[in-house]
């Protein structure tokens, strides 16, 4: 089975998602790590729905801003992924698939209003 592309980040750009997001640094990297935003039991779901980004080593595992070392950055990435997922799917569907909410109540309300709009 072919895995879908990331809905957050274009791998062919050869940029690190966090270098761009945090520092507006668009330098290309020879080596990038694929990071699944929701790991553990949701790693397969992250892959299936394209919830992954490409990171340099410093932003993946080694530096102080590394997603595996920095809870604040990891949670912001999870919130961003949930918001993008819910642009294509419902909040209810996110909860059924991933089993946890990462957004605050205002953001959830905005997304559920979209679900109730007439087609």
Regions found by a protein language model. Give the residues of each.
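Polybasic, low-complexity binding patches
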Residues: 43-53, 61-119
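Cys/His-coordinated zinc-binding microdomains
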Residues: 20-23, 57-60
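Short recognition patches in nucleic-acid-associated and regulatory proteins
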Residues: 24-43
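Secondary-structure junction/capping motif
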Residues: 16, 33, 89-90
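A broad, low-specificity signal marking well-ordered, structured residues that form hydrophobic/aromatic
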Residues: 32, 53-54
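Short, charged surface segments at domain edges that flank catalytic/cofactor-binding sites
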Residues: 1-21, 44-50
């Amino acid at each position: 089975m072919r895995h879908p592309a990331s809905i957050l980040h274009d791998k062919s750009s050869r940029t690190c998602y966090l270098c761009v997001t945090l520092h507006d640094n668009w330098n290309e990297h020879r080596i990038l790590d694929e990071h699944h935003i929701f790991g553990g039991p949701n790693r397969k779901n992250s892959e299936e729905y394209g919830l992954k980004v490409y990171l340099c080593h410093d932003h993946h595992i080694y530096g102080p801003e590394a997603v595996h070392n920095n809870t604040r950055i990891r949670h912001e990435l999870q919130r961003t992924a949930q918001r993008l997922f819910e642009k294509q799917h419902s909040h209810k569907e996110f909860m059924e698939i991933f089993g946890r909410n990462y957004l605050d109540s205002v953001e959830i309300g905005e997304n559920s209003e979209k679900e109730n709009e007439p087609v």
